[in-house]
Amino acid sequence: MDIFGVLSLIGGLAIFLYGMDLLGEGLTGASGGKLEKILEKLTSNPLKAVLLGAGVTAVIQSSSATTVMVVGFVNSGIMKLSQAVGVIMGANIGTTITSWILSLTGIESSNIFISLLKPTSFSPVLAAVGIVFLMFLKKDSLKNPGKIMIGFALLMYGMDAMSSSVAPLAEVPQFASILTAFSNPVLGMLAGMLFTAIIQSSSASVGILQALCSTGILSYATALPIIMGQNIGTCVTALLSSIGATKNGKRAAIIHLYFNVIGTVTFMIVFYALNAVIHFSFLNLTAQEFGIAVIHTAFNIITTAYLLPLRKVLEKLAYATIKLDDDEKRIMDSRSGNEFALLDDRFLEAPSLAVEHCKQVINKMADISRESLFISMSLIGGYDEEQALRVGELETRADKYEDALGTYIMKISTKNLKKEDSEMLNVMLHCIGDFERISDHACNLCDSARELQQKNMQFSPKAETELDILSSAVREAVDISFDAFKSNNKNEADKVEPLEELIDTLAVELKARHIRRLREGKCTIELGFAHSDILNNLERVADHCSNIAVDVIQSDQLEFDAHEYLDRIKNKDNQQFARDYKTYKEKYRLPETRSFK
């Protein structure tokens, strides 16, 4: 094998790996990220966990990626460690789908119809059609099939290139000697483990082994222990991803390692013990692509079958290796100790899932802002220091949420996103600022309430009634806009602007009335300043509610002018706006109406 053969092998491996990645990307895109979301909501049924782990891995074409995702789920507390065991086992089964696809390259027949099943016969056509889909179609839903076709074609082309490059090795005696040495179970297992750990893909490692079948000197006696070692080598990716994870996240990676090590060692002990008695004749046969796929699948199904009932033992081993300390127990029991666990970098490899997690976290942020605002509004009528401290705590949390979400959204935005995910990400990026500012205004209202209490000032009954009416309108604006954001309901979002317009009108009227009371000597200047601050903050809250509603409405529009939209809906010819405004005007009518229009 000369230098050109080595370069051909490296090039074939590169194309093979890229094809596998593109195929997985297309399949993941076609699934719409639904499998990852189902995986997140996994039930405790172990058989379902295995099947789901196998299904997800078959789609994304990587057991390592599935296991890394599981580490992330366990790390964030979404998935219990006991649930993770079944998924990890299923991932080992799902990864064998690649070897079955590659086994098609071994089809040999003079029958034209059977020959058409060989990938080299139809891969060029798939590649051509895939390029058309990818380059000339704009919808992501149509581009994904293109990625699948091109990925499959590249996978086959890479496999063919590797097979062609290693075929001359059949004439090299030294290579035959190396393969013979690897028929030693321990050496073969170590070789498979080391190579897979380096390239971090058991599917690619098995694919290269299938490519070696073209030499005609690879026997099943050599292939079998190498396949066993490949299953251990693939654990490296999950172990690396667990660095920096919580102890529970590390335990998930350890379970993956224990499952593969125990499964491999016990399988090899039993198999070679039986071989000493029965003498399996197939071991001396020349290995074929199809046979390697069978061994790879059978091994993973058998090990899963006898270790699944022992899943509790694997869990205990993980806890014995990484012990549960007092600090971890305290964190697990804490309600707020893991607020941003969903924003785990491991989920960035499944962008749709990462976007969904962002939405869940920002919904919590919205609840925090709403709670802080409603508490502060209640303090104006009756100040309570404990509740005021609560507002400060909530505002601090809202600031942390803004920082964490902003950073994570920026990370997601660098990924290849679906159109709807990109739109949702844009809405969230705009809205986190509004949610944070609302919590700031809540603190301002709290300060005004504290000032009233410290200076022993009190509004007149009429002023209190007017503020209660305005506060009720603001509460409804907050409820409608926040709920519209959570449900992405554009019809609900449309109701915010008429209410915000009314709130502005009410604020102007309340200021005018208060000035009149000042002139009549019914109110002090100092109390007037506090009244003005409260009105300004309530008005600003309504403005942020309007911003949130507009973001929801424009979420699926590439070109959207917010100012043009607001001018259009406020137009006197907009009957729906006029009807909604009239409804709110009746609902929040002030006691005195002589100057209110």
Per-region residue spans from a language model:
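Hydrophobic core segments of alpha-helical transmembrane domains in multi-pass membrane transport
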Residues: 8-21, 53-57, 125-137, 150-162, ...
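Helix-loop-helix hairpins and the membrane-proximal interhelical loops
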Residues: 1-46, 145-194, 212-215
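Alpha-helical transmembrane segments of multi-pass membrane proteins, especially transporters
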Residues: 33, 37, 41, 45, ...
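Membrane-interfacial helix-loop connectors
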Residues: 69-91, 99-121, 196-233, 242-248, ...
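Membrane-embedded alpha-helical segments of transport systems
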Residues: 59-66, 85-102, 119-126, 155, ...
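Short helix-coil transition sites and intra-membrane helix breaks within transmembrane domains
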Residues: 24-28, 57-65, 166-167, 195-204, ...
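Cytosolic, long alpha-helical scaffolding segments
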Residues: 79, 105, 218, 244-250, ...
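Interfacial loop-to-helix junctions that mark the boundaries of transmembrane helices
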Residues: 1-7, 109-121, 175-180, 221, ...
